[in-house]
Amino acid sequence: MSKNYHIAVLPGDGIGPEVMAQALKVMDAVRSRFDMRITTSRYDVGGIAIDNHGHPLPKATVEGCEQADAILFGSVGGPKWENLPPESQPERGALLPLRKHFKLFSNLRPAKLYQGLEAFCPLRADIAANGFDILCVRELTGGIYFGQPKGREGSGQYEKAFDTEVYHRFEIERIARIAFESARKRRRKVTSIDKANVLQSSILWREIVNDVAKTYPDVELAHMYIDNATMQLIKDPSQFDVLLCSNLFGDILSDECAMITGSMGMLPSASLNEQGFGLYEPAGGSAPDIAGKNIANPIAQILSLALLLRYSLDANDAATAIEQAINRALEEGVRTGDLARGAAAVSTDEMGDIIARYVAEGV
């Protein structure tokens, strides 16, 4: 008998509810085709939670997430809540506390150039023609963003500001394991990004990554300095499989990876803890300007579901089925408005219907 899974669904604001509805259609198709027992509960988060409960992350939402196997998150924020105090705004008051509460230390951001979308890639046509499929694995809770001491002191010409890059062995070991385990599900290559020619923290990073690599003899490991990595991503992104990055370097490279795909509407994201519990969300924002118009691209939300299936439910076949269905839709020229470039475009609902049907059919 198959295991029972429960997913906390947090649609949020803007286009969140529209694109989430499409992901849930696809989840229905996965249930049927793979005989998976998946239940869901829906909770308010972000601006809608402020309106309904007076707080961007209500206690009931947190408790519901605690009872779930994973969180499928939409998007939060919008002009309506921009004038609230920063800590009460949807983004800072909901997403960051969720990451902290569940100790989500790793961020996974896939960046893939899909066949038929090469024209959207800002790289040279001959580079785009080679395609790329990269997974950026970023450490989320350590490094210079959180290291102490940090601050400002002094005055006049002696005024100074300082931040501290700190990494502990356990922090590097656990993010490295995420990268190597991810590579085993892909093309078995990890490129670890550092600045070991200058920084002590990067020297330790490289030493520990080398140690972890010994337990993954089936995965190829390469090291690359951050400055070279930013150039190589432009020169030949097809050389990369999994990028393993510290918090700061991952912040930079994950956005560069996203930009060279040419479409934020295609990019999912996963944040995981040590137990495999994760929060899965589109990399883009709530897009309030197009909310309610049935024109948003739901693929990033649907791909977030695929990541959830792969990393939190260990349902790799189901995740692959979703990715194959999306590939088929795009290869057949099915496009939402952001990808149509003047050609006929389908609605948000229609794109969800097509992908769900292809998942059910087993393309």
UniProtKB/Swiss-Prot annotation:
One of its GO terms (molecular function) is NAD binding. Binds 1 Mg(2+) or Mn(2+) ion per subunit. GO terms for biological process: L-leucine biosynthetic process. Coiled coil: none annotated. Its cofactor is Mg(2+); Mn(2+). The record marks 145, 195 as: Important for catalysis. InterPro entries: IsoCit/isopropylmalate_DH_CS, IsoPropMal-DH-like_dom, Isopropylmalate_DH. Pathway: Amino-acid biosynthesis; L-leucine biosynthesis; L-leucine from 3-methyl-2-oxobutanoate: step 3/4. Its EC number is 1.1.1.85. NAD(+) binds at residues 78-91, 285-297. It is found in: Cytoplasm. Pfam families: Iso_dh (PF00180). Its main location: cytoplasm. Belongs to the isocitrate and isopropylmalate dehydrogenases family. LeuB type 1 subfamily. Catalyzes the oxidation of 3-carboxy-2-hydroxy-4-methylpentanoate (3-isopropylmalate) to 3-carboxy-4-methyl-2-oxopentanoate. The product decarboxylates to 4-methyl-2 oxopentanoate. Homodimer. This is 3-isopropylmalate dehydrogenase. It comes from Salmonella paratyphi A (strain ATCC 9150 / SARB42). The gene is leuB.
